[in-house]
């Protein structure tokens, strides 16, 4: 416990809570403070100017980060016929229909993403109570229900992140690992913010991206100066 206290004291001494950091300075600070015995993820929290109580202002989608997330993603695909072969060629780890559903029902879910072709939703629909709470239910809004399952598999393997605002209008996701270099983390974050801006609901008024902060798995959040990021959407 004393070790944790020392770590937290160090973080509090180094991080100015009210300061908005240049992205490169922020990344350098996170790297300095990342002392866990594993390679920590770099996570981002984006406060959006939306009313999360209104369904037409909720933001949900997916985007492929240019440098991936640093995680090896296992993909399960519900499909059949030619699509099954295409999914396997694209690198899917598990492909099937009823047989794959039986594995899920048994609790054998050694995968991170589930993709389904539209004709397979009759099977996947029966698994909603299992996949839904785990955030694994395929959804066309994030490209995981699609006739082009091969592309969905490639995107997932390439480092696609899915995002969805919480009840406070905040997006939480990951943009890589602490051992990525600063330029990679910056470009990943910029790609995410561009995707979010493109997903801005038409009914959302005022400043859309209100605050951006990054943190490591075990570290404190560092607020960013958005002027140091290139997030032009045109």
From Swiss-Prot:
Gene3D superfamilies: 3.30.190.20, 3.40.50.790
InterPro entries membership: Ribosom_uL1_bac-type (IPR005878), Ribosomal_uL1 (IPR002143), Ribosomal_uL1-like (IPR023674), Ribosomal_uL1/biogenesis (IPR028364), Ribosomal_uL1_3-a/b-sand (IPR016095), Ribosomal_uL1_CS (IPR023673)
Key words of the record: Repressor, Ribonucleoprotein, Ribosomal protein, RNA-binding, rRNA-binding, Translation regulation, tRNA-binding
GO molecular function: rRNA binding; structural constituent of ribosome; tRNA binding
Keyword Ribosomal protein carried by entry: yes
One cellular-component annotation, GO: cytosolic large ribosomal subunit
Chain coiled-coil ranges: none
GO process annotations (BP): regulation of translation; translation
Assembly notes: Part of the 50S ribosomal subunit.
Family in the record: Belongs to the universal ribosomal protein uL1 family.
PANTHER family: 54S RIBOSOMAL PROTEIN L1, MITOCHONDRIAL, LARGE RIBOSOMAL SUBUNIT PROTEIN UL1M
Role this protein plays: Binds directly to 23S rRNA. The L1 stalk is quite mobile in the ribosome, and is involved in E site tRNA release. Protein L1 is also a translational repressor protein, it controls the translation of the L11 operon by binding to its mRNA.
Name of the protein this chain belongs to: Large ribosomal subunit protein uL1
Gene encoding the protein: rplA
